[in-house]
Amino acid sequence: MLVDSHCHLDFPDFANELDAVIVRARTAGIERMVTISTRVKRFNELLAITERFPGVYCSVGTHPHNAHEELDVTVADLVAHTKSPKVVALGEAGLDYHYDNSPREAQERGFRTHIAAARETGLPLVIHTREADADTARILEEETGKGAFPAVLHCFTGGPELARRAIALGLSISFTGILTFKNSAALRDIAASLPADRILVETDAPYLAPGKFRGKRNEPAFVVEIAKVLAETRGVSLDEIAQQTTANFFRLFSKVPRPAAAAT
């Protein structure tokens, strides 16, 4: 089995065929999916999707693009939303200096709020970081000094220094279809160098379809293609990478129940 540790099933791209998307994912062996929150104010819509589909879980949080719109969201607000058994993570939160859709101060404030919630609940924080390696590492190191928290750098596109510092802090690193792109040799070098127990796979669907489906809408079933390239990059079999990334997922997203066949 495989898992898609990060997708956006509430996005309009899936509105007319969500049932079929879930069926295709399960047919491809994807038994667990985490659909990721981008706005706390839309949390109930996200939670409703998880309640429709067994094996689908969600996070709660504010994407850095929207940080300035949800500065009133408190640690207590986030923690309260995690009481549902279907809510298994915080985020995605972090820093996006590529688009800078929110002021950087708002992004950092939101990032630290989500870290505090992850620390309090023990649930993993899904971190979005783009073209913000130095500040991301700085904030993570400062906040870890206040107390450890579980987290994953999702859709990793950073440099080797951010990867090194994240691993040193105990974080995991997740790869999307970007890993499969021809111009991603440097990213594949990083993926090859990471400890086996810290790697995850995700689609970030509907975005970033892997090379085989480039230009098409992405969906959870396509995580298989990412796992294939990760396996090739690390010189192991697809079965081994599937087992490893799945074990890593359940260790990090510990609130997600394991299927009977995956229980250890």
Identify the residue ranges that each predicted region occupies.
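Mid-domain alpha/beta scaffold segments of enzyme catalytic cores
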Residues: 1-264
